[in-house]
């Protein structure tokens, strides 16, 4: 994930900033507790494809 993209990309649900989980290759929204997958280098920012998580 390119740093420049991570600076501007936001959660499609609440519009808060996302963090990157390098190990799981996911974009994380800590506000909504959603993890968005990255497939073939492309972030999939669809709520239906996100998984719920609890910290």
Curated annotation (Swiss-Prot):
Family under the similarity heading: Belongs to the UPF0434 family.
Coiled coil: none
UniProt protein name: UPF0434 protein BPEN_388
Entry GO CC: cytosol
Superkingdom of the organism of origin: Bacteria
InterPro entries, per the entry: Trm112-like (IPR005651)
Pfam families in the cross-refs: Trm112p
């Amino acid at each position: 994930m390119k740093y420049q993209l991570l600076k501007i990309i936001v959660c499609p649900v609440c519009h808060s900033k996302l963090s990157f989980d390098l190990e799981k290759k996911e974009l994380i929204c800590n506000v909504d507790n959603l993890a968005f997958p990255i497939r073939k280098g492309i972030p999939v920012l669809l709520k239906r494809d996100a998984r719920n998580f609890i910290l």
